[in-house]
């Protein structure tokens, strides 16, 4: 009998300590108190650029295996539409396959 009373009392103490009251102040990063404004930017959904043109996203480049890739010209980063990934024919074929998969998951219309 005493053991059951001790277990019940311990459970009640744990419940009181574990659940804070409604009057307590919100924590600094509390998800219920913090509000965020999300800005949705319009992005290109259809292709408008050919191989060699400057781009920002894969959706801008026309072609199933064409992606917006990064090259370095004179130490400066330049993004342009490209489909060639290597001078080796086998590696280039594998690269085009990877580009095709990347474009498939870009969800361009």
Swiss-Prot record:
One of its GO terms (molecular function) is ion channel regulator activity. The keyword Acetylation does not apply. Keywords: Disulfide bond, Ion channel impairing toxin, Knottin, Secreted, Signal, Toxin. Coiled coil: none annotated. Residues 1-18 form the signal peptide. Its main location: secreted. Putative ion channel inhibitor. This is Hainantoxin-XVIII. Belongs to the neurotoxin 25 family. F7 subfamily. The keyword Hydrolase does not apply. The presence of a 'disulfide through disulfide knot' structurally defines this protein as a knottin. One of its GO terms (cellular component) is extracellular region. Expressed by the venom gland. Disulfide bonds join 47-62, 55-68, 59-108, 61-81. It comes from Cyriopagopus hainanus. It is found in: Secreted. Residues 19-46 form a propeptide.
